[in-house]
């Protein structure tokens, strides 16, 4: 019997950095920025700094940033979940949630990333190309935009404000 494909991210569950199962439905009616992150990437400092800025600016207006460590690109996220969380929270003082380390491509890709990538993105196919690829998800749980890893988080502000209905 075939498994029913999810129709929104809210139908999926994920694991937090402590291994607890969390339903994404807890983020219903929020705008989500979902990012695959790495601690040892050349883009780490700029991305975390700008993600923090966006989060601090819009968290009270309905934005949630979900960060998913991934070690599939150049072994740039080799640490344990505890090491990763400690690094992000200590070095960058990030307050947005950091989740369990996942894979974003291949057979073992997280169901969340399989849903996000499904069929409508990327000139090189659906695969994530590197660390810090970003997906913007609307309040209905639909991925409405995908941004390349090199896209500065602050350049997403206009799109985020539109989804939050902020002029």
UniProtKB/Swiss-Prot annotation:
GO terms for biological process: response to oxidative stress. The active site is at 41. The keyword Oxidoreductase applies. Gene3D superfamilies: Glutaredoxin (3.40.30.10). Keywords: Oxidoreductase, Peroxidase. Its EC number is 1.11.1.9. InterPro entries: Glutathione_peroxidase, GPX_AS, GPX_CS, Thioredoxin-like_sf. CDD domains: GSH_Peroxidase. It is an enzyme of class 1 (oxidoreductase). The keyword Oxidoreductase applies. SUPFAM superfamilies: Thioredoxin-like. One of its GO terms (molecular function) is peroxidase activity. It comes from the Eukaryota. GO terms for cellular component: cytosol; nucleus. Belongs to the glutathione peroxidase family. May constitute a glutathione peroxidase-like protective system against oxidative stresses. This is Probable glutathione peroxidase 8. It comes from Arabidopsis thaliana (Mouse-ear cress). The lineage of its organism: Eukaryota, Viridiplantae, Streptophyta, Embryophyta, Tracheophyta.
């Amino acid at each position: 019997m075939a498994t029913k494909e999810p129709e929104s991210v809210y139908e999926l569950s994920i694991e937090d950095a402590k291994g607890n199962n969390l339903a994404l439905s807890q983020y219903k009616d929020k705008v989500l920025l979902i990012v695959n992150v790495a601690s040892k990437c050349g883009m780490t400092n700029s991305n975390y700094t700008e993600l923090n800025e966006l989060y601090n600016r819009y968290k009270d207006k309905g934005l949630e940033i979900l960060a998913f460590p991934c070690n599939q690109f150049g072994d740039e996220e080799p640490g344990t979940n505890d090491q990763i969380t400690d690094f992000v929270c200590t070095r960058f003082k990030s307050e947005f949630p950091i989740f369990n380390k996942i894979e974003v491509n291949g057979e073992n890709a997280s169901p969340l990333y399989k849903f996000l990538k499904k069929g409508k993105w990327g000139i090189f196919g659906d695969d994530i190309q590197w660390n810090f690829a970003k997906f913007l998800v609307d309040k209905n749980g639909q991925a409405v935009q995908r941004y390349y890893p090199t896209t500065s988080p602050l350049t997403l502000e206009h799109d985020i404000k539109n989804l939050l209905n902020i002029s």
